[in-house]
Design a protein with these regions (language model features):
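Active-site neighborhoods and metal-handling regions in enzymes and metal-associated proteins
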Residues: 1-391
Length: 391
């Protein structure tokens, strides 16, 4: 039995679930594709991962020749009537099962089971629960090698960040201005020099360009950076090794010798909200279950108390793993875009990145957190003060 199958069984036992039921059509389910292999499967496939007995596969007769797996007892259907009859027989003893759903469908990354399949199970009198925590447990835990890769990516990323702000200073002092796109390209070139992977170029945004959280400059659309401007740099990268973990950070600077009071005031709101999130994790992770939405609430409530809640227009943080993009598939720190009721468990990583996006300028502060032995470990550095770029 593979490690992943052992992990599923262990999770079912620990959480008193009879089974995890997964569906796939034309290899759409990435977990089943990983377990069964990348076979040419063209019809609906059911996988029944059982707690107390062997696992079952229910496959169409056309797909059966391509499915040879000793970890499953295989059942074959020809017609849809046979498919439903066999499924009904397989689940008749279940009382509590996990399926790839989220409450009200608010977490799209795990809401992949279709209405009819879920409804069929419920119509047999079976309680259906979200597999979200199981999928985090299976797919988003970071091993020691992955953690070391994340540390190294963060170390290099933070150094390149320093170089980028230094270049802005040099540009302004030498010619009177810098340029968003030029700094973006400077960072991307440094990534290439250090053999780092990034899916998209970094965000370099000045003043109210930074009021759009996903603004980024292009060669044909870029703004100059002058003395007195507020500068946001959001940058993400990872090592090119297999299964390496992303670094994703955002830092703020002001192109002057000193930071203005208004900029400092807003930044301190963001900094303090992150401090409260980390304190909450320190206080409660070892005592009880902590969910992604709860950390978002801690951050958002503080920002609301300071009068900036309508300017904080996205979730507090996202899962970080080895995916193509820095946005992983695990628990997000979110009670705004979604209500993420997935648990924060050991060996996962996520960002904390609250923002305040007003008409004059936008701000965001972002670091990366790894959970080790129920303790939040800051991997992405912490910005304590806005950088006075010209100092």
């Amino acid at each position: 039995m593979s490690k992943k199958l052992e992990d599923i069984k262990e999770y079912l036992i620990k959480n008193n679930m009879d089974a995890y039921i997964a569906f796939s059509y034309e290899n759409s389910n990435t977990l089943l594709k990983e377990i069964l292999g990348k076979h040419f499967l063209t019809r609906k496939v059911f996988a029944f991962f059982n707690r107390d007995k062997e696992n079952y596969l229910l496959v169409n007769q056309l797909d059966y020749p391509f499915v040879k797996d000793s970890d499953f007892k295989i059942f074959v259907y020809k017609t849809y009537q046979e498919m439903l009859a066999l499924e009904k027989e397989m689940i008749k003893d279940y009382k509590r099962v996990l399926v790839d759903i989220s409450e009200d469908g608010v977490i799209p990354s795990i809401s992949t089971a279709d209405y009819g399949s879920v409804n069929f199970i419920r119509n047999q009198g079976i309680e259906v629960f979200s597999s979200g925590d199981l999928l985090t447990y299976l797919n988003c835990r970071i091993d020691e090698k992955g953690f070391l890769s994340m540390q190294e990516a963060c170390r290099i990323n933070l150094h390149i960040k320093d170089l980028a702000f230094e270049k802005i200073k040099e540009d302004i002092l030498s010619r009177g201005y810098s340029d968003e796109y030029e700094i973006q390209k400077f960072i991307a070139d440094k990534y290439e020099e250090n053999d780092l992977f990034f899916d998209e170029p970094p965000i370099v945004a000045v003043n109210n360009n930074a009021s759009n959280p996903h603004y980024f400059p292009t060669v044909n659309s870029s703004r100059k950076i002058y003395r007195g401007d507020v500068v946001l740099i959001d940058m993400w990268c990872k090592l090119k090794n297999k299964d390496s973990i992303y670094s994703d950070i955002t830092w703020m600077g002001e192109a002057d010798e000193n930071v203005s009071l208004n900029v400092e005031k807003r930044f301190n709101v963001l900094k303090n909200s992150i401090d409260l999130a980390l304190l909450y994790l320190h206080d409660y992770l070892s005592k009880r279950d902590v969910y992604g939405y709860q950390i978002d609430d801690v951050v958002r409530n503080y920002i609301r108390d300071k009068g900036y809640d309508k300017y904080f227009i996205h979730r507090t943080g996202h899962s970080i793993f080895s995916d193509l993009s820095p946005h992983g598939k695990g628990v997000n720190i979110d009670d705004y875009e979604t209500r993420d009721e997935r648990r924060i468990i050991n060996d996962i990583a996520f960002s904390l990145e609250p923002g305040i996006y007003m008409d004059d300028f936008g701000m965001r502060s972002e670091t990366d957190v790894f959970i080790h032995d129920n303790v939040p470990v800051i991997v992405g550095g912490r910005q304590e003060k806005v950088i006075p770029i010209l100092k």
